[in-house]
Amino acid sequence: MMILVNAWGSVTVEARICKSRSQKFKGPCVSEDNCANVCHTEGFPDGDCDGLLRRCYCNTHC
């Protein structure tokens, strides 16, 4: 986790995102919405298409 303090003294927290290849998504990933929906069924909060081969990766906070 990265914590930043700006000039005004407020604190900003940025969480890292971990990616895991979807176990249920089949074929090339052409729709971010379809990928995210499959990731939801796997218990992840989000998912997106990534990489040269356009695979579906599920995202979660590390």
Swiss-Prot record:
Intrachain disulfide bonds: 18-62, 29-49, 35-56, 39-58
CDD domains noted in UniProt: Knot1
Gene Ontology terms describing biological process: defense response; defense response to fungus; killing of cells of another organism
Keyword Signal on entry: yes
Keyword Transferase: no
Listed SMART domains: Knot1
Compartment list: Secreted
First and last residue of the signal peptide: 1-15
Keywords: Antimicrobial, Disulfide bond, Fungicide, Plant defense, Secreted, Signal
GO CC field: extracellular region; plant-type cell wall
The organism's place on the tree of life at top rank: Eukaryota
InterPro entries hit by this protein: Defensin_plant, Scorpion_toxin-like, Scorpion_toxin-like_sf
Similarity comment: family membership: Belongs to the DEFL family.
Protein name: Putative defensin-like protein 3
Gene name of the encoded protein: LCR71
